[in-house]
Amino acid sequence: FIDLSADFRIEDSKLYKNWYFLNHNAKNLVKKSIYSIPEFTKNRIKNYRIIANPGCYPTSIQLALIPLLKKSLIEANNIIIDSKSGYSGAGKNYKSKFTHQNIESSIFAYGIGSHRHMAEMDQEFKKILKSNIEYNFTPHLLPTFRGILSTIYLKVKKNVKITKVHSELKKIYKKSIFIKVLKINTPMGSGNVLNTNNCEISVCKTRYNNKIIIFSSIDNLVKGASGQAIQNMNLAYGYKESLGLK
């Protein structure tokens, strides 16, 4: 089955309790589950009984960063991640959570340095590097209902040019039906991906040769939730990956 909660995203039950303040009552099933961003797991997903659907922020962020970390193209420290989401990202009871703010007409930072989605990102990044990466993540809610735009500030490795970063992302997602890597320095927002299972990624230069900015945009309610669950289901059962999504 496919689980859209966080219950099977965190493989370490102690970490799960630290972040979610709950005892895991199905520890025996955690080993039978896979944390699945389908672009990275499609060849393994059939081997697992339980599919843990990732969080919305981690989906947008990992689609941009994981290929670059795997190829050691970027420095794994001092990464700044600024993610902005429609207020639906705060859950169905968002109004009760932010009673002191008029969330439908203001911008609001929350979960500063402590958002629970960091737990799954820590875990997945560590699988690649075998050590923790150093990053700061701050999510913001915008006065719009849906959509996520993650802005990621990072430093490239010595002698790595922006064209190499861009070409690697293009190569990784060449056959992907849902991920689109835009031309270098393409300004972007969330409008193109709303109500779709798509992700758009843009790599942009800065005035410093060793620093770049990557933008990654998804619909938090589709690629960040139900759409990704359907994509995972299609792959798990051998259906066409885009079934019900295109």
Tell where the protein language model's regions lie, with residue ranges.
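N-terminal Rossmann-like NAD(P) cofactor-binding subdomain of oxidoreductases
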Residues: 1-105, 110-112, 204-208, 243
